[in-house]
């Protein structure tokens, strides 16, 4: 018995792995940017930091996955956008620290390598990288029979960005009286899907719920996470924002306080939050308490900015989209987030 046949009999298809690499090359090429060194397939991805032109560079890194949203991608056999979700979860975190994404690496683990499916996954990763301005400089596809079912896979990503030391955003500049501006989310994004799947467990995904304005349920549930790099980066370069919050797992209650010091709080005007139809549907069909919705989901705001009052008009001018003035920073009395 040859070694190759022995490995194949154990459930690992080496040839399928090679095919994945060949299929994804054209997608990786789309993400090329200044600073990338070497070619795809090396032992390590390389990047020349001097090409960024940053005088006092601070590297900022982030890693994340997309949770059980993957289970819906598998259920509905739609894999071409889940990669964008993975990129978004990572780059939105580092943009919140004031960093411009430079490069990205992905990791896919599966029970059986399916070259067509994983080309779709990586095409989504590449699309996310293009939107973020990050190069896809490396990755890994691990075939692990026995660990995962044949149709199952997991996806994680790793982003590295750079910031001028003087432009880092760490919450220290946020002050009482700052205005809280919200940028719209594209949907649920990539958090809370264990609850989402429970609520819609008996649905096929083809339903046209009245709350969803003519869209099929599965399309709304798999809407890719918005990437905020292009919107936020010009504001960071002009030093117009004092704090940035990426509203992910834990919703408003967990993420907004990460924007500022412990002696401050956020006062949110609920009437000004652009709640998306899917959240109204989740609250209704899941019988979820209204206040709990803000503890789980982004509720229609995926990125929150703390801005000095005198800079609000300039921020709105630079952002070519609706901007929601949803609250302000106050002195903390009890709770870190007060929703009125």
UniProtKB/Swiss-Prot annotation:
Q: Which reaction does it catalyse?
A: 2-formamido-N(1)-(5-O-phospho-beta-D-ribosyl)acetamidine + ATP = 5-amino-1-(5-phospho-beta-D-ribosyl)imidazole + ADP + phosphate + H(+)
The UniProt GO MF terms for this protein read:
ATP binding; phosphoribosylamine-glycine ligase activity; phosphoribosylformylglycinamidine cyclo-ligase activity
The UniProt entry, under Pfam families, shows:
AIRS (PF00586), AIRS_C (PF02769)
Q: Does the keyword Lipoprotein apply?
A: no
- GO cellular component, as recorded: cytosol
* Keywords noted in UniProt: ATP-binding, Cytoplasm, Ligase, Nucleotide-binding, Purine biosynthesis
Tell me which EC number(s) this protein carries: 6.3.3.1
Q: Which GO BP terms apply?
A: 'de novo' IMP biosynthetic process; adenine biosynthetic process
Supply the NCBIfam families for this chain.
Answer: purM (TIGR00878)
What family is this?
Belongs to the AIR synthase family.
Q: Which HAMAP family match?
A: AIRS
Know the name of this protein?
Phosphoribosylformylglycinamidine cyclo-ligase
Q: Which gene encodes it?
A: purM
């Amino acid at each position: 018995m040859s070694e190759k046949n022995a490995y194949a009999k154990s459930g690992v298809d080496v040839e399928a792995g090679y095919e994945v690499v060949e299929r994804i090359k054209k997608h990786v090429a789309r993400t090329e940017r200044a600073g990338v060194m070497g070619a795809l397939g090396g032992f390590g991805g390389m990047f020349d930091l001097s090409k960024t032109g940053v005088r006092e560079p601070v590297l900022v890194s982030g890693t994340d996955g997309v949770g059980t949203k993957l289970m819906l991608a598998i259920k509905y056999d739609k894999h071409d956008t889940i990669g964008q979700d993975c990129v978004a979860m990572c780059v939105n975190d580092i943009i919140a620290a004031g960093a411009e994404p430079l490069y990205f690496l992905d990791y896919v683990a599966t029970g059986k390598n399916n070259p067509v499916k994983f080309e779709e996954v990586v095409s989504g990763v590449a699309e996310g990288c293009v939107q973020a301005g990050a190069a896809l400089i490396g990755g890994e596809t691990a075939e692990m029979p026995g660990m995962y079912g044949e149709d199952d896979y997991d996806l994680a990503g790793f982003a590295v960005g750079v910031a001028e030391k003087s432009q880092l955003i760490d919450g220290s500049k946020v002050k009482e009286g700052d205005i809280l501006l919200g940028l719209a989310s594209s949907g649920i994004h990539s958090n809370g899907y264990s609850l989402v799947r429970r609520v819609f467990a008996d649905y096929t995904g083809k339903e046209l719920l009245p709350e969803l304005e003519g869209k099929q349920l599965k399309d709304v549930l798999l809407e890719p996470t918005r990437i905020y790099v292009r919107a936020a980066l010009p504001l960071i370069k002009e030093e117009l924002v004092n704090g940035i919050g990426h509203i992910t797992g834990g919703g408003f209650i967990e993420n907004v306080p990460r924007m500022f010091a412990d002696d401050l709080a956020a006062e949110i005007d609920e009437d000004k939050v652009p709640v998306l139809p899917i959240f109204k549907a989740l609250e209704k069909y899941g019988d979820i308490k209204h206040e709990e919705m803000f503890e789980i989901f982004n509720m229609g705001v995926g990125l929150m900015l703390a801005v000095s009052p005198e800079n609000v008009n300039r921020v709105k001018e630079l952002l070519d989209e609706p901007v929601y003035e949803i609250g302000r920073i106050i002195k903390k009395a009890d709770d870190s987030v007060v929703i009125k």
